[in-house]
Every structure is written in structure tokens, then in C-alpha cells.
Regions:
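SAM-dependent transferase fold signal centered on methyltransferase-like domains
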Residues: 1-190
């Protein structure tokens, strides 16, 4: 077993001889380490495991190594799903999305669906409230988080321009989709 930085490119690990497993370890919302396990004489694709460490134990998701066919969309449905660090690094979010019939939004590692996604510690679920042009969104007074994906302005600049205080229940995604810029207001379900 070898321990690697969370920044390691998984494609580099695939070059290791007799690689049987790759564990992506998440703790408190951060990818903490990547473990590569090699067994003498092992031949075949490695099992990919997303491991979520908690104070009272751990939860694992394991890849099936099946081919994945995702459908991509430009517009959002009723719900938005954002994979956590272990799912994002392991790319197991693609397997879950295929099983759950989620559609991959063309922005980042975000998915959308009209069905309420199941509750999971491996991803965050949001209800889409509004999709608008930059700075045209109607924001709730209780505040929220801001995350940018490909958007040129820093979240603090966006927050200042909007005059929106910090909060936990709501989130604003400032995204760049091709040449278009959008702001997506969502309400956290977890």
C-alpha cells in the first residue's frame, strides 16, 4: 500500500503494476488522501473506493467497473446534485448518476433531476429556486453561500456586488456555461 496526496492524478496510479484497489479518503468535507493497494500477481482493473470517514466509523462506495453512459443537459431540472470530494476525485459520481438516472449539467461535476435524490453523505442535494442572468437573481434575505464554477469573479466580489450576507440554507452558483454567464439560486435539502 502506498499513500498519495489528494492532488494525485488517478491516471498516474493506473500505471502501477498489480494495482488492485484505489481508496479516496474524505474527512469533514475534504479529500484527505489517496491510497493505492497492490497485490502481487493481480491482473485486471482496480476497484475504486470512495471512503467517507466519520467519528463513529466509515462508509464506502465501490466501483462496479461498468461502462457509463451519461446524458448531458444545458438546462436545470427541479433538483441539483453536487458530489462531495471523494465522489468527485473517484469519479464514482458518474456511476451513481447513471443508476439514479440523473443528467449531467454541462457545468462542472453537477447533476440535475426532476426526482428528489436520495439522501447521502457522499453528495449534496439542492432544490433549484431560480436561474438568472448575472446579478438579476432575487435573493432571500437570510443569506447563503456562493460558489463559482468557471465564473471570472471571486465569490467575495459577487457577494459584495449583491449585498448578500453569508448563510447556510441557500447557495448561489455563479457559473460560466460556454460564453454565457448564469447565477443559479438553490436551497439546500440536507
Amino acid at each position: 500500500m502506498t499513500k498519495h496526496s489528494p492532488m494525485v492524478d488517478l491516471n498516474v496510479l493506473y500505471e502501477l503494476e498489480h494495482l488492485s484497489e484505489i481508496h479516496i479518503v474524505e474527512y469533514q468535507g475534504e479529500c484527505k488522501e489517496v491510497l493505492a493497494i497492490q497485490h502481487e500477481g493481480y491482473i485486471g482493473p482496480p476497484a475504486i473506493k470512495a471512503v467517507l470517514l466519520q467519528e463513529n466509523g466509515s462508509i464506502e462506495l465501490i466501483s462496479s467497473n461498468k461502462a457509463i453512459a451519461l446524458s448531458f443537459v444545458n438546462e436545470l431540472d427541479e433538483y441539483l446534485i453536487q458530489p462531495g470530494p471523494a465522489l468527485a476525485k473517484s469519479k464514482l459520481h458518474e456511476e451513481i448518476a447513471t443508476k439514479q438516472l440523473w443528467k449531467k449539467w454541462t457545468v462542472g461535476n453537477l447533476y440535475t433531476t426532476d426526482e428528489l435524490p436520495p439522501n447521502s453523505l457522499f453528495f449534496k442535494r439542492y432544490k433549484v429556486i431560480e436561474v438568472a442572468k448575472p446579478y438579476k437573481v432575487k435573493l432571500p434575505s437570510e443569506g447563503g453561500a456562493i460558489e463559482r464554477i468557471g465564473y471570472p469573479e471571486h465569490p467575495e466580489v459577487i457577494r459584495k456586488k449583491l449585498g448578500w450576507k453569508e448563510g447556510r440554507e441557500n447557495k448561489l452558483f455563479a457559473v460560466k456555461q460556454g460564453k454565457n454567464k448564469l447565477m443559479v439560486l438553490v436551497k439546500r435539502l440536507d
